[in-house]
């Protein structure tokens, strides 16, 4: 993942020398709820730092909402900025052709980022190969292992003032294992929902007891029963 991000930053820097959007554009793909949009929102400031841009115009739009719009007008408003197209596989032929044409012109190096799930993105690349050639770097968000998801859980809960005890950790491992399927692997979004539910359950229980479940560092402890 780190290598992919480094490659993107290098590629974007090369593309910035040209005032068009013919190169230096990015594809971001991954499974459902794997944090694609969140990654993009962090990637854009990183690109701005790489290009020494203090601030830049950014627009997020779903492909189905972009269809039928005046792409040239949108690109003019976003000149030198970022156009993020979500669910990119829904782009119509007409919109894809117009976008391709606009990206050949002077966009002041506007960067276009396409986002979709892997299957959808592969369909788009196959359907619009001419447009796809302009996307010279790609971030493929990997499927996370159980250990990686649990490590995320540790960080996420601590950021929210909670800590998972040993039995709670075993319960979380078990919960992830039960829900981890080959055709639909567990993702960060699903684990986050599990943790939000556990934290809400623990927080609700605090008002029913005179003594709070707080450790020496001030973290509220999540127990096995909070994950049931």
Residue ranges and their predicted role:
Residues 91-130:
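Conserved catalytic/switch belt of AAA+ P-loop NTPases
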Residues 23-56, 135:
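Walker A/P-loop
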